[in-house]
Amino acid sequence: MSIIMTGGGTGGHLAIIKAVKEQLKGEELIYIGSTTGQDRQWFENDEDFTETYFFDTRGVVNQRGFGKLKSLWMMLQAMMKARKLLKKYDAKVVFSVGGFSSAATAFAAKSASVPLVIHEQNAALGSLNKLLRPYAAAFISSYLEESPIKAYPIKEVFFDNVRVRKNVETIIFLGGSQGAKAINKLALEIAPKLKERGIRIIHQAGEKNIDEVRKDYEDIGIEAEVFGFTTKLADYMKEADLAIARAGASTLWELSATALPTLFIPYPYAVSDHQYYNAQFLVEKDLAWIMREGEIDTQKVLALLGEDLETKSRGLMEIVEKDGSKQIADLLKNYAKS
């Protein structure tokens, strides 16, 4: 008897699987992903999984004409392979986090009558999750009132680093491991004003931009901690008093778990504008700020330094539940036992 975990492509999806699997120690776990995207990089050598499989699949929605047909054919072939694996490992439940790499296994679960539990990480539903939602045994979303579990699966370390913010002594710019040009530009524009106020700068500029951004800071005589990918993100968040960040779901909830007040600048080309709606979920509760990339105003950004951080920080501590990963893991265990 096993629990099958599937989905990914991007770090946001994969972070959910990572958080949940850590609460499933002792269970037989199988991961099925794609050769495209980051799946293999994250889980190929992960010893928590009994076996890992990576099929040749790719997105369908972003393809046209013959490319779409080819993607569908690849998915059909992968689905047949996934069905065999569900039978081989006597799968009792399939946990899907969405993304194109989950499609084959999610459809295999439906065709083989294996319970399908779906986690939707964004406020705007992904195309695949929207399609499969009526067939899911459970559909989990932190943004939906009817969700059986509202808590987002966040790694414990982010809760361990929680603290109430009052004054801005350190600011962190988070553009993700790939970086965000708009956030990099904003950081460098306001850096002199931050220096005048004695505010320390931590800046995730993106792997490809590290050298350029470091030089830009040096050219204007400002010390800043600049990095790309890091395994110490929770520690950096702990040190910061204010964040300026993209609004990917994992980043948003990790910042919230750390009770770090944030100005979100959503990635403007995200599918269904989901980053905007992710951020809006907190903005409507007066727990964050939002600014469209094309409407960035440095004076308004600097004005946030004098805002009431404590109220937002305490508010974040109240709305974020700590045991989302465990709640999902317990649900999967119940299906595995039935």
From Swiss-Prot:
One of its GO terms (molecular function) is undecaprenyldiphospho-muramoylpentapeptide beta-N-acetylglucosaminyltransferase activity. Gene3D superfamilies: Glycogen Phosphorylase B (3.40.50.2000). UDP-N-acetyl-alpha-D-glucosamine binds at T10, G11, G12, N122, S177, Q275. It catalyses: di-trans,octa-cis-undecaprenyl diphospho-N-acetyl-alpha-D-muramoyl-L-alanyl-D-glutamyl-meso-2,6-diaminopimeloyl-D-alanyl-D-alanine + UDP-N-acetyl-alpha-D-glucosamine = di-trans,octa-cis-undecaprenyl diphospho-[N-acetyl-alpha-D-glucosaminyl-(1->4)]-N-acetyl-alpha-D-muramoyl-L-alanyl-D-glutamyl-meso-2,6-diaminopimeloyl-D-alanyl-D-alanine + UDP + H(+). InterPro entries: GlcNAc_MurG, Glyco_trans_28_C, GlycoTrans_28_N. Pathway: Cell wall biogenesis; peptidoglycan biosynthesis. GO terms for biological process: carbohydrate metabolic process; cell division; cell wall organization; lipid glycosylation; peptidoglycan biosynthetic process; regulation of cell shape. The keyword Membrane applies. Keywords: Cell cycle, Cell division, Cell inner membrane, Cell membrane, Cell shape, Cell wall biogenesis/degradation, Glycosyltransferase, Membrane, Peptidoglycan synthesis, Transferase. Its main location: membrane. It is a peripheral membrane protein. It is found in: Cell inner membrane. It comes from the Bacteria. One of its GO terms (cellular component) is plasma membrane. CDD domains: GT28_MurG (cd03785). Its EC number is 2.4.1.227. Cell wall formation. Catalyzes the transfer of a GlcNAc subunit on undecaprenyl-pyrophosphoryl-MurNAc-pentapeptide (lipid intermediate I) to form undecaprenyl-pyrophosphoryl-MurNAc-(pentapeptide)GlcNAc (lipid intermediate II). Belongs to the glycosyltransferase 28 family. MurG subfamily. NCBIfam families: murG. This is UDP-N-acetylglucosamine--N-acetylmuramyl-(pentapeptide) pyrophosphoryl-undecaprenol N-acetylglucosamine transferase. The gene is murG.
